[in-house]
Amino acid sequence: MKQELPVTIAIVDDNALIRESVKFRLSSLGYNVVLEAENGQEFLDKLHVNRAPDICVLDINMPVMDGMETTVHLKKDWPGMKIIFFSMEDRSIYYSKGIELGADGFVAKDAPFAELNNMLISLMNQSQVA
């Protein structure tokens, strides 16, 4: 079963170059990047006036509100949103904590871009089955 509308994605990262790079690469693969923010608080503020995306690609270590705290808010107020931690932080430390909080996956920023694409495909397939 195919979704009628393209999956929508948000990118939340305090590094503007990373946001632009990820947006460009995802857009070139046909993904619809609908929101960007430089920290969790800015993203939450934008969610109150915009349609929530299907998937959030979320950095962990950001000023104002980090990815962990953002995840708690997202799962409380937008429980259907899928969350992929996208970070340079140590996976062994943050993966388990992120899953506990409700994140759906973790991709290292220095991993091949195909890993992020594969994670997105996996989450889209899970959503189509549900």
Functional labels for PLM-detected ranges:
Residues 68-79:
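Short amphipathic alpha-helix used as the core "switch/output" element in two-component signaling
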Residues 16-35:
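Two-component/phosphorelay signaling modules centered on CheY-like receiver
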Residues 51-57:
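Active-site beta3 strand of CheY-like receiver
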Residues 93, 111-124:
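C-terminal output helix
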